[in-house]
Amino acid sequence: MPTRWRATAAVLVCALHLALFVPTIGDWSSILVNDFAPQAKAIKDGELPYRDQRIEYPPLSVPVLIAPAYFDDSTQGFVDGFMWEMLAFDLAIIVLIALALPGEGGRVLSALGVYTVGLVTLSGVVLDRSLIDYGPLALDRFDLVPTLFVLGAVLARDRERSATWSGLLSLGVAIKAFPLFLYPALLRGERNLRRVIVAGAIPLLACAAAVIVMGDEFGSAITYHTERTLQVESLGASVFEVAHVLGASGVSTGVGHGGFEISASGATAAGWLSVVVGAAGYFWLVWAGWRSKATNFELVAALLAVLVVFAPVLSPQFLLWLLPVSACAYGLGRQNIVLLLAILFTQIELQHYDGVDALSGSFVWPLAVRNVLLLGYLALVAAPIVRDGRKTASPSDRGHRRPPNLSRGGVATAPR
């Protein structure tokens, strides 16, 4: 696809996003008003992020969170600034897909289309708004920031830029930890491990040094996540919620760790089961992926899917991790049809969030459908990788275990 057409596509899609999202700038958001704005103002005024404000995210998230407060530290000013900041990252993702995704025009346009439809649907810009936030979900959270770095890392890996992809992925880890679990996918076939290690270590060591120099400590963020129990929107919780709607007793919700959690006999065991199954699925996909001919985008999408689907905490914004990667991997394929349906039912569930206290059917059923769709999506993206891995690992193919080298278009080629 000629560069001028790529640039034209980027401009047009950016204009569409601006037209849809700019009118929402400043809309009320519970997390921005009640959490991020007070935390940002306190840190700007000298308090420590972890010791004093109990920030739950890695160190490089702090500049992202507090930057708007330096322009206007009023609550409304912070909300406006934060949403503009996230809109800038949204536009950066569009530009990156339009200009850097290899392939013909159809691949680029379909990726941009899937990303746009998914983002608009999940953000409630066209559909009814969420009952949690009036503002768009994509602009009320900062998940687009690490997602941009993940997207850049995969594109750099396709171009065999060892230091670049590792550095970008490490920056994502330093903002929100989930990109750490994508290293195995991008290490497949990598020949310059020294550059990967050095480039990946620099952002993390810089963050650690900054925390130490400030006299702060990061342990509270780790403790926060290890103490979280089964969240109402997780796959494991859906079993209890559906049972409650069908008449089972002893199932309720409670507020804890920034959200609603399931209280029921067996909920703790279900949470641990989700972790165990998710870990097993993750390592299985890594093993199969190293033996398969899946592209980097496909393997990263599969690993993200297993992380999201089996997480004991499955917040709606986690789907933003998947969306642009899956859009680039599968375009208008059935995988993304299922993912977009899952996003649609996520938004429907958010429109009925007033049913979370009583676990009413209007909340539980859309959520259950969403989780089934996410399971279906995981099956669609993981099954080809597992099948391919098994074939390559068969006795007749044991001489061909070397992972494929991926060309710039993400197509397996012979090692050079």
Model-derived features with residue positions:
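Multi-pass membrane glycosyltransferase architecture that uses lipid-linked
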Residues: 1-224, 270-416
